[in-house]
Curated annotation (Swiss-Prot):
Keyword flag Calcium: no
SUPFAM superfamilies on file: C-terminal domain of adenylylcyclase associated protein, N-terminal domain of adenylylcyclase associated protein, CAP
Family stated for the protein in its record: Belongs to the CAP family.
Lineage: Eukaryota, Amoebozoa, Evosea, Eumycetozoa, Dictyostelia
Any one GO CC term of the record: phagocytic vesicle membrane
Organism from which the protein derives: Dictyostelium discoideum (Social amoeba)
InterPro entries xrefs: Adenylate_cyclase-assoc_CAP, Adenylate_cyclase-assoc_CAP_C, Adenylate_cyclase-assoc_CAP_N, C-CAP_CF_C-like, CAP/MinC_C, CAP_C_sf, CAP_CS_C, CAP_CS_N
Top-rank taxon, per record: Eukaryota
Protein location: Cell membrane
Residue ranges occupied by any C-CAP/cofactor C-like domain in the UniProt entry: 304-443
Name of protein: Adenylyl cyclase-associated protein
Molecular functions (GO terms): actin binding; adenylate cyclase binding
SMART domains noted in UniProt: CARP
């Protein structure tokens, strides 16, 4: 080997040694930096994982402007969204804990989930205490979809659960858009931010938590790593306790009840049927991520525990918690007034005149007879109800309802009926002559979908 070659090799060896020393210094510096940054400055231990950072990105992109818009719309909406933000912060803390910890016992997971239950219950309470608010649809959109938070205990497919909750929200956000599109851009932006947050959350879950909340098999003890949420939780409400038992992702309602159902453990899965658009049955009165919409609804309306209400509040007639009352009559109402019937059982409501709109929410074995409605008649989260139209109504909407009989007069045969996530629906129309019996027609519940070209073609299938 020549002297020149040896010199060249020594030069290369020296260069390699220099590079190795630089790498060693870099690593040492990085470790020190990491150690420093891991010092708890805000209650969290350890560096945040990519999933935590991405979750925060969703919050920054959608929830931050959503909060500002909520406060701008109305105090009650702002207050409710404050509780929503606290719940989201608690969920972020749980995701962070999961990224650093092994999957805990059910008892420990129960403690980790408690803040979500508490804040979700507050969201529902704010809605229930503001039923006369002009922003009731906004309050309901959040309250009825708050169950999206329970995806952290849904297995093996939490993504669809969030999609179901989004469907529940859209039942109300669509009303908001119908009323305010082109009139109030703040309302439109409010809807856009919330719905898009839920859509992006579903994508986020599919990417980072495909089969359930991802825990770190090499992590530490979840109990010791649990950070306290930035906002202290309010006094624990009388809401059902959250359960740590993972639930299947089928259809799940809202959170307070969502976690209430989860607390049943294995019993929950026996009636598995989450709430989604397809089951918006998030009957958040039955907000449980695994309970069948119909089942939960019934459970909640069976025994109203509050004082009965029958009063005109502004332009809205509120009829609530009536039991075995067959003599509820609204005589000569104003056409600008609306009628809201909530959690009534085995009762009859008569409306003698024209009103703007009618809503039955969470009622059981309740009937309503009315003459004319300018806008619509809506049935949500009900069981075994009857609607009789003696005059006219443009549309009837049925959502998350089990058992609905609709009696149409000759003047109302052009009424459009829209149904979703409902069953046992029948329409009775007059016969060919006055002496003929009513003709009963069943609203289809089963559909067949096929791909034609690049589009889906759906048609109802006849019942056997």
């Amino acid at each position: 080997m020549s002297e020149a070659t040896i010199v060249e090799l020594l030069k290369r060896l020296d260069q390699a040694t220099t590079r190795l020393e630089a790498v060693e210094k870099s690593i040492a510096s990085g470790v020190a930096s990491s150690s420093s940054s891991s010092s708890p400055s805000s209650g969290a231990a350890g560096p945040s994982s990519a999933s935590v950072k991405e979750f925060q990105n969703l919050v920054d992109q959608h929830i931050t402007p959503f909060v500002a818009l909520s406060k701008k719309l109305a105090p009650e909406v702002g207050n409710q969204v404050e509780q929503l933000v606290k719940a989201i912060d608690a969920e972020k803390a749980l995701i962070n804990t999961a990224s650093q910890s092994k999957k805990p016992s059910q008892e420990t997971l129960l403690e980790l989930i408690k803040p979500l239950n508490n804040f979700a219950a507050e969201v529902g309470k704010i809605r229930d205490s503001n039923r006369s608010s002009k922003f009731f649809n906004n309050l309901s959109a959040i309250s009825e979809s708050i169950g999206f938070l329970s995806w952290v205990v849904v297995e093996p497919t939490p993504g669809p659960h969030v999609a179901e909750m989004r469907g529940s929200a859209e039942f109300y956000t669509n009303r908001i858009l119908k009323e305010f599109k082109g009139v109030n851009q703040d309302q439109v932006d409010w809807v856009s931010n919330y719905v898009n947050f839920l859509k992006d959350l579903e994508k986020y879950i599919k990417q980072y938590h495909t089969t359930g909340l991802t825990w770190n098999p090499k992590g530490g003890d979840a109990k010791s790593a649990t950070p306290a949420p930035a906002s202290s939780a309010p006094a624990a409400p009388v809401a059902p306790a959250v359960s740590s038992t993972p639930v299947e992702s089928k259809k799940g309602p809202g959170l307070g009840a969502v976690f209430g159902e989860l607390s049943k453990g294995d019993g929950v899965t026996s009636g598995l049927k989450k709430v989604t658009n397809d089951m918006k049955s998030k009957n958040f009165t039955d907000k449980s991520s695994v309970v069948k919409a119909a089942d939960t609804k019934v459970a909640k309306v069976d025994a109203p525990s509050r004082p009965a209400v029958f009063a005109l509040q502004g332009n809205k007639w509120s009829i609530e918690y009536q039991v075995n009352n067959k003599e509820i009559v609204i005589a000569e109402p104003d056409s600008r007034q609306t009628v809201y019937i909530f959690q009534c059982v085995n009762s009859l409501v008569q409306i003698k005149g024209k009103v703007n709109a009618i809503t039955l929410d969470g009622c059981k074995k309740t009937s309503i007879v009315f003459e004319n409605a300018i806008s619509s008649c809506e049935v949500v989260n009900c069981n075994g109800v009857e609607i009789q139209v003696t005059g006219r109504v443009p549309s009837i909407a049925i959502d998350k309802t089990s058992g609905c009989q609709i009696y149409l007069s000759k003047d109302s045969l052009e009424t459009e009926i829209v149904s979703s996530k409902s069953s046992e629906m029948n329409v009775l129309i007059p016969g060919a002559t006055e002496n003929d019996d009513l003709v009963e027609l069943a609203i289809p519940e089963q559909y067949k979908t096929s791909v034609k070209g690049n589009k889906l073609h759906t048609e109802s299938t006849s019942h056997i």
